Regions:
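Conserved, mostly hydrophobic/aromatic
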Residues: 30
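Auxiliary Fe-S-binding modules of radical SAM enzymes
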Residues: 2-20, 24
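Conserved Radical SAM active-site core
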Residues: 7, 37-178
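Generic structural "secondary-structure junction" signal
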Residues: 15-18, 80, 186
Length: 191
């Protein structure tokens, strides 16, 4: 079999979703590296005047940190510039989709869910999966998420729901659309 490509990501974590339809739902997050936008106008005093922008990430010495968690949160420009600026590339993880699935399972595992399943073995609650970035619908990230979802299906460990935090600029790949419909149909047939 063809060996899987490795993808750059900045972090995997779990938390309770705080926005939108899945507010309050336990969520596993994968934050991909790279974005097609930079959004330097965020938080600026004069967002329509780029010549006035302050971009604190630009002057930050990225060699002083070795973990994403130790970066400051910028209040001007993109608050997650570490997810796309090349100067932070040394902080990124690099794994195949199958390895990323294992990292996510490990993140989800605890004393009551030792296997890290999306369907909690005791409460029967289903965890949510959120792909974010960066831009999680750039072609490389779409490919990675499609392969990851296939691995989750093959392992009979399917997220209760899946969302993408996207800027909405990317064309959807055919395999992405196909795996999305598969996921929707699987949920429609559940009792």
């Amino acid at each position: 079999s063809m060996s899987e490509k490795e993808y750059l990501y900045s972090e995997v974590f779990d938390s309770i979703q705080g926005e939108g339809t899945y507010t309050g739902v336990h969520t596993l997050w994968l934050r991909f590296f790279l974005c097609n936008l930079q959004c330097n106008g965020f938080g600026q005093l004069f967002p329509t005047k780029p010549e006035t922008y302050e971009l604190p990430f630009e002057s930050f010495d990225a060699t002083t940190v070795n973990r994403v968690e130790d970066l400051p949160v910028w209040d001007k420009g993109c608050d997650s510039s570490y997810t796309w600026s090349k100067k932070f590339k040394h902080l990124m993880g690099k794994k195949t989709p199958k390895e990323l699935c294992e990292v996510i399972k490990k993140c989800a595992s605890n004393e009551t869910n030792p296997e890290g399943m999306f369907l909690h073995p005791i409460s029967k609650m289903k965890s949510h999966m959120c792909f974010t970035g960066g831009e999680p619908l750039m072609a490389h990230a779409q490919m990675a998420s499609v392969q990851m979802l296939r691995h989750f299906y093959n392992d009979n460990n399917v997220p209760g729901s899946v969302t993408y935090e996207t800027n909405g600029t990317q064309k959807l790949r055919d395999d992405f659309i196909a795996v999305s419909y598969t996921h929707l149909r699987a949920h429609e047939t559940e009792s």
